[in-house]
Every structure is written in structure tokens, then in C-alpha cells.
Amino acid sequence: MSVKYFEPEEIVEHNNSKDMYMVINGKVYDVSNFADDHPGGLDIMLDYAGQDATKAYQDIGHSIAADELLEEMYIGDLKPGTEERLKELKKPRSFDNDTPPLPLLIALIVLPAIAVIVFVKLNK
């Protein structure tokens, strides 16, 4: 079986809870289906989504069982010699398509508040 090599530009695109790649020790893992179940929580996974998470993974000291689980998510290798480019390409994490944008959230809060104020003033 031949190894698939990933360019950094492809890795950084997979940076949200529904579509998440991580690089650990030069290997690329699709952790999308595991992120919600991670014992440390989804937020820590999102902090490293689409990036090289080697240092964070090693610093925590994961168990053998965690290493075995990680291997099940292996999808290929980072193209050799592109490690620095991956660090440079770090993108801000993207928000899932089901997360409403901030202006919409503000409108949903402000407009009803204005409606209540107008209603109260008209009914005095």
C-alpha cells in the first residue's frame, strides 16, 4: 500500500469540528469523528485542527490505547520538507457551517429588544 502525501495547504483547510486533520510526528490523521469524544474536550482539539499537533500530543503523554486509536485515524504523511510551511500557513480555525454568524446573533437579540421597548411605549 502506497502512502498518500499531503501538502500543508490541504491540511490547514481541515480545521473545524466536522472536518479535522492533525499532523503528529509527520503523519496525517483525520480526527473528525473523534473530536467530540476526546477526553480533553472539543476545544483543545480545535486549537490544533489543521496544524501540527506533535508537541501538544507528546507533552500530554498519551496512553498506549490512545496511540493505537490514533493509528486507526491515519490517512497519510505530511509531504517531506514541508513542516515549516505548515507552521507558516496556520489558519484561524473556521467555524462550522451550522454556527450562525455574529451579526445574525446580534440581530436576533437587538431586534426583539427594540420591539419590546416600542410595544411598551405605545401601550402606556
From Swiss-Prot:
Keywords recorded for this protein, A-Z: Electron transport, Endoplasmic reticulum, Heme, Iron, Membrane, Metal-binding, Microsome, Transmembrane, Transmembrane helix, Transport
UniProt-recorded name of the protein: Probable cytochrome b5 1
Entry similarity comment: Belongs to the cytochrome b5 family.
Statement: the UniProt record of this protein carries the keyword Endoplasmic reticulum: yes
Protein's organism: Schizosaccharomyces pombe (strain 972 / ATCC 24843)
Organism lineage: Eukaryota, Fungi, Dikarya, Ascomycota, Taphrinomycotina
General function of this protein: Membrane bound hemoprotein which function as an electron carrier for several membrane bound oxygenases.
Membrane topology: Single-pass membrane protein
The UniProt record lists the keyword Nucleus: no
Residue intervals of the Cytochrome b5 heme-binding domain: 3-79
Source species, domain of life: Eukaryota
UniProt xrefs under Gene3D superfamilies: Cytochrome b5-like heme/steroid binding domain (3.10.120.10)
Binding-site positions, heme: H38, H62
A family per Pfam: Cyt-b5
